[in-house]
Amino acid sequence: MAEPARTLAQDPRLADADQVRWTRCPNCRSLVYLRRLRRNGHVCPDCAHHMRMGVHDRIESLLDAGSFERFGADVAPVDVLGFTDSRPYTERLAQAQRRSGSNEAVLCGTGTIDGAPLVVAALDFGFLGGSVGGVTGELVARAARTALDRRTPLVLVCASGGARMQEGTISLMQMAKTSQEVARLHEAGVLVVSIGTDPTYGGVTASFGMLGDVVVAEPGARIGFAGPQVIRQTIRQELPAGFQTAEYLRDAGMVDLVVPRHELRAHLARLLRVHSGGTAAPAAERGYRTRPRPAADRDASEVLHAARDIGRPSTSDYCARIFEDFVELHGDRVSGDDPAVVAGIGTLGGRPVVVVGHQKGHETAELVQRNFGMPQPAGYHKARRMMDYAERFGFPLVTFVDTPGAHPGVDAEQRGQGTAIAECISRMARLKVPAVSVVTGEGGSGGALALGVGNRVLVLENAYYSVISPEGCSTILWGTAERTSQAAEQLRITAEDLLRLGVVDGVVDEPAGGAQQDHAAMASRLAAALRASIGELSELDGDALLDQRRRRFDRFGDPDHSDSEVQP
């Protein structure tokens, strides 16, 4: 396992004056000139290994030059327990203070990134291993309170071995103290970004370190609650390769983004831009039609084939073309990151939005990797997490529906597929922000509806929406899949049928030959429909949005609304 970089000790190849000018990369073992290393952000120029970075260099690398204004520098820790191990705690503190030039293991202040204001609290691993004592927690809490008072985002840079044992339960209580301050920011809709650097363990991971609305980590950063040595010595368990690394945690659904150090400032700037967005100008056109066109009626089996064309734009394609500053966020914070669901934030005409959608792909390898757009429970958990995100910040929600259905495997059932879908539907139904759902390809049963409980539901011209796949319907009702075309016709799955039924509120027409023929034109039409829909819905307050959505779905199956039923 890699060790922190250190200066060379009596290397015979170097003159004495050079001993403090070079260091050896703990990963690839190459010699690196210290000035070059610092210019490269303490990242090895040969292997890209991210070495530990001093807290002052960290602040300098992230914030606009000259913008940092420190607070809390005069607050110093107290030896409340009179603790002594091999040395008195007071001696350890004094030594750490001399070496670091700071009173504590955290540097707090205000500043800007690309002009956007924020509050930052950065832990200093060089000060007693970044351990959290009473004053450390107090300063982190003060940073959170400052962010709340100013209603500016809080960025927490974490590097810590955990709680400071020399302060006993006073240290332990900082987990609760800092967590409740972060919770207040969540309640107030103030953005919190947590950045995990190497290493981040113990009480920091189990409190503010993993409570960010967005959790970012540097490549290779070791992050966990119990460290590897504790696990091995306590329960004698061998650990898998890559365990507790940033990449491992991203795949496990706990981290949104693994970002190389030289890209971190740009990623933060994008997040801040999205969260500082305002209202959009009125849409110039509606972008969709609300009346069926008899001439547009097509054979249902033809629509079925078109909806499944792997050349059609995917959710990722729409995110890249429609939303400015789109940032994909990963993970459900419970069990994993399902690639069959793409989620993130961006802006639409200057208005911040949250986006969630099924994701298939265009090539065989991606289709397999995305499970053909069939989500596992983790995918629906991720979607629900992003619905919470939308409501927390008052952002409209846009969902793209394109799935043959939820994954039907044993593993999905064991992890509660039905519950995951039900909770997703329930959460979307209760949102007090505008929600617009668009069926862009396949709308397969409950797995589709989980992302389809919008205030406004649109469908693309060549998409379909159905209670079951026509093949499944044919097999169950006729005992053979040979009557799929008949089943498709009788299920009334086409855009025109759905509009007559009132299941959708509008149809977005596709370019000649279908959406797969011109991604840019399709994205432009869909962007117009989304801007118009969100603009209209944004005129309603939260309670009115909730009531409108409830009434929209209440009418289905109500005999008093028989006028919306399809005519034979």
UniProtKB/Swiss-Prot annotation:
<keyword id="KW-0275">Fatty acid biosynthesis</keyword>
<keyword id="KW-0547">Nucleotide-binding</keyword>
<protein>
    <recommendedName>
        <fullName>Acetyl-coenzyme A carboxylase carboxyl transferase subunits beta/alpha</fullName>
        <ecNumber>2.1.3.15</ecNumber>
    </recommendedName>
</protein>
<dbReference type="InterPro" id="IPR000438">
    <property type="entry name" value="Acetyl_CoA_COase_Trfase_b_su"/>
</dbReference>
<feature type="binding site">
    <location>
        <position position="47"/>
    </location>
    <ligand>
        <name>Zn(2+)</name>
    </ligand>
</feature>
<feature type="region of interest" description="Carboxyltransferase">
    <location>
        <begin position="21"/>
        <end position="536"/>
    </location>
</feature>
<keyword id="KW-0863">Zinc-finger</keyword>
<feature type="domain" description="CoA carboxyltransferase N-terminal">
    <location>
        <begin position="21"/>
        <end position="290"/>
    </location>
</feature>
<dbReference type="Pfam" id="PF17848">
    <property type="entry name" value="Zn_ribbon_ACC"/>
</dbReference>
<keyword id="KW-0808">Transferase</keyword>
<keyword id="KW-0862">Zinc</keyword>
<feature type="domain" description="CoA carboxyltransferase C-terminal">
    <location>
        <begin position="286"/>
        <end position="536"/>
    </location>
</feature>
<dbReference type="GO" id="GO:2001295">
    <property type="term" value="P:malonyl-CoA biosynthetic process"/>
</dbReference>
<dbReference type="GO" id="GO:0003989">
    <property type="term" value="F:acetyl-CoA carboxylase activity"/>
</dbReference>
<dbReference type="InterPro" id="IPR011763">
    <property type="entry name" value="COA_CT_C"/>
</dbReference>
<dbReference type="GO" id="GO:0005524">
    <property type="term" value="F:ATP binding"/>
</dbReference>
<comment type="similarity">
    <text>In the N-terminal section; belongs to the AccD/PCCB family.</text>
</comment>
<dbReference type="GO" id="GO:0016743">
    <property type="term" value="F:carboxyl- or carbamoyltransferase activity"/>
</dbReference>
<feature type="region of interest" description="Acetyl-coenzyme A carboxylase carboxyl transferase subunit beta">
    <location>
        <begin position="1"/>
        <end position="253"/>
    </location>
</feature>
<dbReference type="GO" id="GO:0008270">
    <property type="term" value="F:zinc ion binding"/>
</dbReference>
<feature type="region of interest" description="Acetyl-coenzyme A carboxylase carboxyl transferase subunit alpha">
    <location>
        <begin position="254"/>
        <end position="559"/>
    </location>
</feature>
<keyword id="KW-0479">Metal-binding</keyword>
<keyword id="KW-0963">Cytoplasm</keyword>
<dbReference type="InterPro" id="IPR011762">
    <property type="entry name" value="COA_CT_N"/>
</dbReference>
<comment type="function">
    <text>Component of the acetyl coenzyme A carboxylase (ACC) complex. Biotin carboxylase (BC) catalyzes the carboxylation of biotin on its carrier protein (BCCP) and then the CO(2) group is transferred by the transcarboxylase to acetyl-CoA to form malonyl-CoA.</text>
</comment>
<dbReference type="InterPro" id="IPR041010">
    <property type="entry name" value="Znf-ACC"/>
</dbReference>
<dbReference type="InterPro" id="IPR001095">
    <property type="entry name" value="Acetyl_CoA_COase_a_su"/>
</dbReference>
<comment type="similarity">
    <text>In the C-terminal section; belongs to the AccA family.</text>
</comment>
<keyword id="KW-0443">Lipid metabolism</keyword>
<feature type="binding site">
    <location>
        <position position="28"/>
    </location>
    <ligand>
        <name>Zn(2+)</name>
    </ligand>
</feature>
<dbReference type="Pfam" id="PF03255">
    <property type="entry name" value="ACCA"/>
</dbReference>
<dbReference type="GO" id="GO:0009317">
    <property type="term" value="C:acetyl-CoA carboxylase complex"/>
</dbReference>
<comment type="subunit">
    <text>Acetyl-CoA carboxylase is a heterotetramer composed of biotin carboxyl carrier protein (AccB), biotin carboxylase (AccC) and two subunits of ACCase subunit beta/alpha.</text>
</comment>
<comment type="pathway">
    <text>Lipid metabolism; malonyl-CoA biosynthesis; malonyl-CoA from acetyl-CoA: step 1/1.</text>
</comment>
<keyword id="KW-0067">ATP-binding</keyword>
<dbReference type="GO" id="GO:0006633">
    <property type="term" value="P:fatty acid biosynthetic process"/>
</dbReference>
<feature type="zinc finger region" description="C4-type">
    <location>
        <begin position="25"/>
        <end position="47"/>
    </location>
</feature>
<keyword id="KW-0276">Fatty acid metabolism</keyword>
<feature type="binding site">
    <location>
        <position position="44"/>
    </location>
    <ligand>
        <name>Zn(2+)</name>
    </ligand>
</feature>
<dbReference type="InterPro" id="IPR029045">
    <property type="entry name" value="ClpP/crotonase-like_dom_sf"/>
</dbReference>
<feature type="binding site">
    <location>
        <position position="25"/>
    </location>
    <ligand>
        <name>Zn(2+)</name>
    </ligand>
</feature>
<keyword id="KW-0444">Lipid biosynthesis</keyword>
